[in-house]
Amino acid sequence: MAATAAAANGTGGSSGMEVDAAVVPSVMASGVTGSVSVALHPLVILNISDHWIRMRSQEGRPMQVIGALIGKQEGRNIEVMNSFELLSHTVEEKIIIDKEYYYTKEEQFKQVFKELDFLGWYTTGGPPDPSDIHVHKQVCEIIESPLFLKLNPMTKHTDLPVSVFESVIDIINGEATMLFAELTYTLATEEAERIGVDHVARMTATGSGENSTVAEHLIAQHSAIKMLHSRVKLILEYVKASEAGEVPFNHEILREAYALCHCLPVLSTDKFKTDFYDQCNDVGLMAYLGTITKTCNTMNQFVNKFNVLYDRQGIGRRMRGLFF
């Protein structure tokens, strides 16, 4: 079930989403109609937002992030279903994509999502600029006619701050120049995505509105633990002050503190030991399976390379035999 991006936000209009600033004319093609129809899944937007937030938290400032878009394409209809992060380096103020990292990630995703193909790339920031053209040309070396999705996390508009582009070649001053043409898109959701998006929508930044049941339960637990910590800290400070002679002994308070300590569950029971060892075994088994999987992958790569080398040597021997 799909709805237009504007309708999903309660606003009209089916053309591309607005951004804070005017689009840079030098990289945008005017009067060009999109050649493909794009359906965008909310999971992609959530992945990009999560990627940007994590990088901002790590670096302490807003950072531009880059990733790959994967999905399905049938003729002129493109469905962007998922995404993954890409590594990049800055050389002389130009972004260079780590293609080896991309090929590794693509191989991993192909093992899980065999039906999904690489469709394009995404980044964050304002309107498209020449640096985006530079990165887009690198992506064109991997796939022909890739999509370009840009999310503006700093916008203050109520519309969805996502724009999708395709590249076109135009003649400017007698030279072939790559430009971006904006595409219209729709939001396509599946049942699992609708549940996840509904949960995120309930968790507002201001705390107003209806919160999810899980969030309310965690907030109540956090408040209770915070209060317990403050009370235990107060009792501990009183006991230390009594031992140091700073305050007089109050045997009634000390007896209540002693009784409170004995109310706590004893963690040396057989059931606790059994559950504890079971959990330790589960964690160790997961780590062991991960190591085995990594070792199998290494062995598989070694066998593939060995087979390639063996085949080359066999071909060489057969070719030499022809001359005799």
Swiss-Prot record:
Classification via PROSITE patterns: MPN (PS50249)
Gene3D superfamilies on file: Cytidine Deaminase, domain 2
Classification via CDD domains: MPN_CSN6
GO cellular component: COP9 signalosome; cytoplasm
Domain MPN: 38-171
SMART domains assigned: JAB_MPN
GO annotation terms (biological process): protein deneddylation
Keywords, comma-separated and alphabetical: Cytoplasm, Nucleus, Signalosome
InterPro entries tied to this protein: EIF3F/CSN6-like_C, JAMM/MPN+_dom, MPN, MPN_CSN6
Function: Component of the COP9 signalosome complex (CSN), a complex involved in various cellular and developmental processes. The CSN complex is an essential regulator of the ubiquitin (Ubl) conjugation pathway by mediating the deneddylation of the cullin subunits of SCF-type E3 ligase complexes, leading to decrease the Ubl ligase activity of SCF-type complexes such as SCF, CSA or DDB2. The complex is also involved in phosphorylation of p53/TP53, c-jun/JUN, IkappaBalpha/NFKBIA, ITPK1 and IRF8, possibly via its association with CK2 and PKD kinases.
GO MF: metallopeptidase activity
Primary site of residence: cytoplasm
Record-given protein name: COP9 signalosome complex subunit 6
Keyword Lipid metabolism among UniProt keywords: no
Subunit structure: Component of the CSN complex, composed of COPS1/GPS1, COPS2, COPS3, COPS4, COPS5, COPS6, COPS7 (COPS7A or COPS7B), COPS8 and COPS9. In the complex, it probably interacts directly with COPS2, COPS4, COPS5, COPS7 (COPS7A or COPS7B) and COPS9. Interacts with the translation initiation factor EIF3S6. Interacts weakly with RBX1. Directly interacts with COP1 and 14-3-3 protein sigma/SFN. Interacts with ERCC6.
Subcellular location: Cytoplasm; Nucleus
UniProt family annotation: Belongs to the peptidase M67A family. CSN6 subfamily.
